[in-house]
């Protein structure tokens, strides 16, 4: 899953695109490198990012989705939003196929009803707190168990509402310390009990560059290591900034598994 941020302030500068020419160039690059789906986001979730009104988020998404339809109409497209009205617009008007909700329905209580009505796949992500508060003092007794239970409860609720095409995302970096992130990664296999596909988003995040020292721009090597570990531990989808490196990691893991 290649990341397309139609924002001016996402945490990794290399993923920011605002103008149609930039969006088109980014999409062509990801498609050529082997992206199998595109995730379009118009609201930066990094702590301290400027708030964006629903109207502005929709305007950005309309612009981005229009270019996606032009460049790669054959690829599935997810829309990265926690707002139900934005999700509805993106699917019904913009042609998005999947809703990717970083808040797991917690920041807009209409989200579950909306995706059930849209009958589209839904990416359910765990986050403790909100983007503004999530890194102030995250606390868990057992992060792997608590994240698994949290996801399981919401998957059950979604099933009861008629939403059955669900992908689970443990939410690396969202309301978790460095130690929490690596404990969660170490126990990633625990999420197999959810019996849904697993998405992992660790690309160029602080769990890479804070551990190694450096910045998001210097975090590709560490990201590739985490992608490899995630695939070996059962991840089905990688949400990535650097498609070529992720595709190569996937090919190597698949070759190892084929010959094991």
List PLM regions with ranges.
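N-terminal glycine-rich anion-binding loops that anchor highly charged ligand groups
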Residues: 1-2, 29-42
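Active-site-adjacent loop and "lid" segments of alpha/beta metabolic enzymes
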Residues: 11-29, 45-63, 67-70, 76-78, ...
């Amino acid at each position: 899953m290649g990341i397309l941020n139609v924002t001016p302030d996402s945490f990794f500068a290399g993923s920011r695109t605002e103008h149609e020419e930039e969006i088109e160039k980014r999409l062509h690059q990801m498609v050529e490198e082997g992206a199998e789906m595109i995730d379009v986001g118009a609201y930066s979730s990094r702590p301290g990012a400027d708030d964006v009104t629903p109207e502005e988020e929709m305007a950005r998404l309309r612009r981005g989705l229009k270019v996606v339809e032009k460049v790669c109409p054959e690829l599935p497209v997810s829309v990265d939003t926690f707002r139900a009205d934005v999700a509805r617009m993106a699917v019904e008007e913009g042609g998005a196929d999947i809703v990717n909700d970083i808040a797991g329905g917690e920041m807009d209580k209409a989200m579950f009803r909306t995706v059930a009505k849209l009958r589209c796949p839904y990416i359910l992500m765990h986050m403790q707190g909100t983007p503004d508060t999530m890194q102030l003092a995250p606390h868990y007794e057992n992060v792997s168990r608590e994240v698994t239970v949290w996801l399981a409860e919401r998957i059950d609720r979604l099933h009861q509402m008629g939403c059955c095409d669900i992908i689970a995302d443990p939410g690396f970096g969202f309301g978790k310390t460095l130690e929490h992130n690596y404990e969660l990664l170490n126990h990633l296999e625990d999420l197999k009990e959810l019996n849904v596909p697993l998405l992992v988003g660790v690309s160029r995040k602080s769990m890479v560059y804070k551990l190694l020292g450096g910045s998001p721009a210097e975090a590709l090597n560490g990201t590739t290591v985490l992608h490899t570990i995630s695939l070996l531990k059962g991840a089905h989808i990688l949400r990535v900034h650097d498609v070529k490196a992720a595709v190569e990691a996937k090919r190597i893991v698949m070759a190892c598994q084929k010959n094991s």
